[in-house]
């Protein structure tokens, strides 16, 4: 396997909290898939959850080489967790098309957060 994409993003959690306080769920509805939005609304720390998902999708779009836009939307990238709690990444629509264009077969994701920041790295591999 070869690495065909690498993306990293960092988000200040307080910036997301301020946006949510100012605009309500507008950002969450733009960034999160329907399944992610359900988790967000029930989460004990929704702004922290949103910050991590925002950073994850930005990192994934960078790894795809497009950024958000140019055919790739926040809605085309889903961040979940496996049965052990480790983060997973799934691509649909424009993000999946770009993944296939890169002849990539798998995406790996690491999410970390501390008091003030969330940081994510995404690696995309081909066979």
From Swiss-Prot:
HAMAP family: AcpS. Its EC number is 2.7.8.7. Its cofactor is Mg(2+). Transfers the 4'-phosphopantetheine moiety from coenzyme A to a Ser of acyl-carrier-protein. Belongs to the P-Pant transferase superfamily. AcpS family. It is found in: Cytoplasm. The lineage of its organism: Bacteria, Pseudomonadati, Pseudomonadota, Gammaproteobacteria, Alteromonadales. InterPro entries: 4-PPantetheinyl_Trfase_dom (IPR008278), 4-PPantetheinyl_Trfase_dom_sf (IPR037143), ACPS (IPR002582), Ppantetheine-prot_Trfase_dom (IPR004568). This is Holo-[acyl-carrier-protein] synthase. One of its GO terms (molecular function) is magnesium ion binding. It catalyses: apo-[ACP] + CoA = holo-[ACP] + adenosine 3',5'-bisphosphate + H(+). Signal peptide: none annotated. Disulfide bonds: none annotated. One of its GO terms (biological process) is fatty acid biosynthetic process. Keywords: Cytoplasm, Fatty acid biosynthesis, Fatty acid metabolism, Lipid biosynthesis, Lipid metabolism, Magnesium, Metal-binding, Transferase. The gene is acpS. It comes from the Bacteria. One of its GO terms (cellular component) is cytoplasm. Mg(2+) binds at residues 9, 58. SUPFAM superfamilies: 4'-phosphopantetheinyl transferase.
